[in-house]
Each structure stands twice: as structure tokens, then as C-alpha cells.
Amino acid sequence: GMGLGFFFFFPNARVVYSKLDTALTSGDADDYAKILIAAPNKPLIDIEISSIDAYSSYNIKVQGTKGTLKATPAAYEMTYIVDGENPDRPVIEESLKDEGGNPIYCWEPLNKHVEGESFNGNAFDVGTAKLYDQLYYKITEGRPMTVTPEMAAAVISVIETVHAQNPLPLKY
């Protein structure tokens, strides 16, 4: 659900590609997911959730046309650009060279923003406690929930779509 948080900003979003796999699982649970979500005139959302890469520095990675979010159970980090902060640059038609006339690789500086945070605890202690705190304050004081039933329904709809597109054979 973490990567699907972007889904709520795009009311006409739909799953345009999905792939589930059980590469390193002896049972019948998915351990890999690749999901592309698109909406008219919005950035493409590329979600990859994997527990099969032995060298990955993240469990979830969401790539968009303006930035990337990566996360582990311990922390998350986002790197992104803001429209208007990076001016258009003219096309350079001749070969790029350094001061000595040697060819160089083209690059340009981008004004990027980086945010991140470490999580204290895990989904089963801190996450569950925060959910129950929110439920308590919703019932007793009417405070809004961070995740509404409508948001949960949208995430469940995407999950159901992805599972319908990728039926797993029953092993047991």
C-alpha cells in the first residue's frame, strides 16, 4: 500500500501493466511485484516491490517522472525535482570537449530535493499502535484518519486488479 499512496492524487488512474512472481518462495505467496499506473496528463507511476534481490538496498521503489521513493522496513528516502526550478537548456550540437580537447560525457546539474526518515519500531508494534491511536481519536474526538476507508478501497481495488491480471496456480 505504501507505493499506492500516489494513486489517490489521480482519480482516473488505472493499472496499465502488472507482474507478480514467486521466484524464491516455496509456498504460493508473491515475493515480487511490478506495477505501472497511469492517469491522463499525470506522471507514470512505476512500483516495484521485491524480496528476491540479494543486493537491493530497498524493499520498495516507486519511480515517477519527477522523482523516486525507496524504502525499507527501517527507513525511507525520496529524491525529486520541482517544476520550474530547473531551466530548459539549449541543445549543444557540437561534440562536447574538456579544456584539453578530449571528449567528455554530457551531464547537467539538477536542483533536486531529498527527504527521508528512519522508522522507530516496525509495522507490528509502532504501526499497529498508531492505527489504534487513530481509531480511538476518530471515535472519541472525530479526528480524521490518515488513511480513509476510500483510500483503503482504492488500494484494495488496485491489488484485486493486479491479482486478476496475474493468477497464481494453486500448489496446495
Q: Locations of the language-model features?
A:
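Generic domain-boundary/flexible-linker signal
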Residues: G27, Y58, A71-P73, Y80, ...
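Generic structural signal for secondary-structure transition and capping sites
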Residues: A13-R14, L44, G67, P144, ...
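C-terminal capping/lid region of NAD(P)-dependent oxidoreductase domains
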Residues: A164-Y172
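Rossmann-like dinucleotide-binding domain that binds NAD(P)(H)
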Residues: G1-Y55, N59-K61, A75, E150-A153
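Conserved short C-terminal alpha-helix that flanks the catalytic cleft of nucleotide-sugar-dependent
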Residues: I156
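Residues at helix-coil transition
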Residues: F10, Y137-E141, A164
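A general structural signal for well-ordered alpha-helical segments in protein cores
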Residues: G1-G5, T128, Y132-D133, I159
